A protein has these predicted regions:
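Membrane-interface segments at or immediately adjacent to transmembrane helices
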Residues: 1-50
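Solvent-exposed soluble domains appended to multi-pass membrane proteins
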Residues: 36-334
Length: 334
């Protein structure tokens, strides 16, 4: 409690005063025997024929780029609009591209926990806003820290929003960089904080000049592809796809430059969104296409390009790293 009070005392006080909802009874749909049978069936077999090793090193440096709302609606290889994300489309042929990945939620606070802790998003509550729960979750950064990784997180916005700072610190991120670490002009370059071209440039310089001993893990959350979708880029007439095209442009330039640095050789770059985006606004937002998202593994640590069509969920990423990262078993079950 004292740790969370120091991180965000106002939020911790209001959160404690508002504890009145019994989530256990609200979401207990199955008896224990049926739940166990269903849960066991989710685990893949582990025979040799079903496993593909995808990396050429056991302890890569790991960069996770969580792209704001970057859903399949804008990614042509997933059936999305053409010419919105040409850089991502190109990069999808250079790494391990998962074509049947689905988001688990619709908000950044939920999607962040889904991604980094492998914890399902709840429809009526944000686990990130419940410190008593979020601090007990397993997490990618926590597991990697135990394995000797240095960990840090970059976000160009207000890192206290939705209690994000508390969640990130309690789940293993040792250093946080946010909007207040940039100049005032940079902080106000977007309605939500620092525009993506600025944070991508900052990240590039950090990685290019990094001289830490031992492996490291960095996570980066973008923000420009969020309403009101006002960005310093004007390639498409519709401002919504244009905002995603802007983030795609920033991503493409960043990856192309990073390839030319020594950091690329032992690097695993994982690109996925925090959640999808309802566009075009036709039909129900409960349709599967609304949750369809891209997931791409890039970097010098990747053995060879391949496409994985197996259905998976956003939470699978966190579960994979929490269970396997520090023993060097980076594999895909097919």
């Amino acid at each position: 409690f004292l740790n969370h009070s120091a991180v965000n005392p106002d939020f911790s006080l209001l959160s404690s005063m508002g504890k009145s909802q019994n989530f256990a009874s609200e979401f207990n749909f199955f008896d224990e025997e049926k739940r166990a049978a269903l849960f066991d069936g989710l685990y893949p077999t582990t025979d040799g024929d079903s496993i593909i090793q995808v990396l050429n090193t056991k302890r890569p440096n790991i960069l996770i780029i969580l792209m704001e709302g970057f859903g399949g609606a804008f990614v042509e290889p997933l059936g999305g609009l053409p010419d919105v994300t040409p850089h991502f489309n190109r990069l999808s042929k250079e790494g391990v591209f998962f074509t049947n990945c689905y988001a688990n939620s619709f908000r950044t606070d939920r999607g962040t926990v889904c991604t980094f802790s492998g914890y399902l998003g709840l429809p009526t509550a944000s686990v990130m806003k419940i410190p008593a729960k979020s601090r007990t979750l397993p997490a990618i950064a926590e597991g990697l820290s135990k394995a000797g990784y240095k960990t840090d997180f970059l976000y160009g916005g207000d890192i206290n929003f939705t209690n994000m700072k508390s969640y990130l610190l309690s789940t293993g991120y040792q250093r946080l960089t946010a909007n207040t670490d940039f100049s005032l002009a940079e902080q106000t370059s977007n309605a939500w904080g620092v525009n993506d071209d600025i944070t991508f440039e900052y990240l590039y310089n950090q990685l290019r000049n990094r001289k830490e001993e031992g492996p490291w893990h960095t996570a980066f959350l973008t923000l420009s592809s969020h309403e009101p979708f006002e960005v310093p880029y004007h390639r498409l007439e519709d401002k919504i796809p244009n905002a995603f095209a802007y983030t795609d442009e920033c991503l493409g330039k960043f990856i192309d430059r990073l390839k030319q640095t020594p950091a690329w050789k032992d690097l695993l770059v994982i690109c996925l969104p925090d959640h999808s985006f309802y566009y075009p606004r036709e039909g129900s937002n409960a349709m599967p296409r609304f949750y369809h998202i891209p997931l791409l593994w890039l970097g010098g640590a990747v053995k060879q390009p391949m496409q994985v069509d197996k259905i998976m969920n956003q939470t699978d990423l966190g579960s994979h790293f929490v269970g396997a990262a520090w023993v060097g078993t980076y594999c895909i079950y097919v």
